[in-house]
Swiss-Prot record:
Catalytic residues, chain numbering: C103 (nucleophile), C200 (cysteine persulfide intermediate)
Record bears the keyword Plastid: no
Any single GO CC term annotated in Swiss-Prot or TrEMBL for this entry: cytoplasm
InterPro entries listed in its UniProt record: MnmA-like, MnmA-like_C, MnmA-like_central, MnmA-like_central_sf, Rossmann-like_a/b/a_fold
Keywords recorded for this protein, A-Z: ATP-binding, Cytoplasm, Disulfide bond, Nucleotide-binding, RNA-binding, Transferase, tRNA processing, tRNA-binding
Official protein name in the record: tRNA-specific 2-thiouridylase MnmA
Main location as per UniProt: cytoplasm
Length: 369
């Protein structure tokens, strides 16, 4: 333990149970531990959705209980410039971005990492993410979290091995029920607090209402794959591929009552294209093209290789073959067709437990008709 006693770790305290237990685990490992609460969003809509104040109070209560100092920092300007504006631009272009991935890249493992090292003298930062780190041949690899249900490596694929090397992930070695049990034993205020599910800055608020404040909605037609107009949408940005709920259309005489699914968006003409059945051929893809690639611990792809991929969080691994197209684009071919591959989302690659990296889905490769 003594080799850690000179090492200072700044834990990103979110006011949740995972970061709370992370701080305690690091104390047990002998580190000098301090907390940092990041405010990434300037609330301007009253207290309806604002959890920042109560989250800060919970983070402070945990730090008081553990006897550690809590620092606060405001990254709202960085968040707006580097995460939120990109998020809006993607939606405007008809794609479905994942802002949590960008937030980890630009805020938690960039702005926070720099602030902790330069202003607080940290040797490491730590977060409550369910991932693991393994140091092999002088490089730090990113591994899936031990708890398969909670593994968050999908959200951290943009980290380089140097960022992973400066980060600790204490709860990644545990299963979620064990983390809750530890928090209850320690009588932490966060022990029974539910996990946050909203997009990192929007929180739990109604997504459609929030987006409408920044992007004017443009209603348009809902058209079937056969060209029949069967309804009206309130804005393409509110819909994503594979979506079933919230379309406001029932079954048809020919198709029976089988539910409708979004299978495509015609951004140019502002048309939402739908088909009946969750496995309709128009919803299936045989592969994808990915760009804006980030590899955690490997060189850029120069030759084909096989691995597995996830095209969204908590999806089962999809066996695939990856081929380079050019310096920053790859073609991914699935072993079996996959439903609802969504441009703008991330494709993240794995070899066993190791997260290799990933990229943004530029286009899907549709099932040949």
């Amino acid at each position: 333990m003594s080799d850690n006693s000179q090492k200072k770790v700044i834990v990103g305290m979110s006011g949740g149970v995972d970061s709370s237990v992370s701080a305690w685990l690091l104390q047990q490992q002998g580190y000098q531990v301090e907390g940092l609460f990041m405010k990434n969003w300037e609330e301007d809509d009253g207290e309806d959705y604002c959890t920042a104040a109560s989250d800060l109070a919970d983070a402070q209560a945990v730090c008081d209980k553990l006897g550690i100092e809590l620092h606060t920092v405001n990254f709202a300007a960085e968040y707006w410039d580097n995460v939120f504006e990109h998020f809006l631009a993607e939606y405007k272009a008809g794609r479905t971005p994942n802002p949590d991935i960008l937030c980890n890249k630009e805020i938690k493992f960039k702005a926070f990492l720099e602030f902790a090292a330069e202003d607080l003298g940290a040797d490491y930062i730590a977060t409550g993410h369910y991932v693991r780190r393994a140091d092999v041949d002088g490089k730090s690899r990113l591994l899936r979290g031990l708890d398969g249900n909670k593994d968050q490596s999908y959200f951290l694929y943009t980290l380089g091995h140097d960022q992973v090397a400066q980060s600790l992930f204490p709860v990644g070695e545990l299963e979620k029920p064990e983390v809750r049990r530890i928090a209850e034993e320690l009588d932490l205020v966060t022990a029974k607090k539910k996990d946050s599910t909203g997009i990192c800055f929007i929180g739990e608020r109604k997504f459609r209402e929030f987006l409408g404040r920044y992007l004017p909605a443009q209603p348009g037609k809902i058209v079937t794959v056969d060209g029949d107009t069967i309804g009206e949408h309130q804005g393409l940005m509110y819909h994503t591929l594979g979506q079933r709920k919230g379309l406001g259309i029932g079954g048809t005489k020919d198709g029976g009552e089988e539910p409708w699914y979004v299978v495509d968006k015609d951004v140019e003409n502002n048309i939402l294209i739908v088909a009946q059945g969750h496995d309709h051929p128009r919803l299936m893809s045989v592969g994808l093209i990915a760009q804006q690639l980030h590899w955690v611990d490997r060189e850029p792809v120069t030759a084909p290789f096989t691995c597995s991929v996830k095209t969204r969080y908590r999806q089962a691994d999809i066996p695939c073959t990856v081929r380079p197209l050019d310096d920053d684009r790859i073609e991914v071919v699935f072993d079996e067709p996959v439903a609802a591959v969504t441009p703008g989302q991330s494709a993240v690659f794995y070899l066993g437990e190791v997260c290799l990296g990933g990229g943004i889905i530029e286009q899907r490769l549709p099932l040949p008709v």
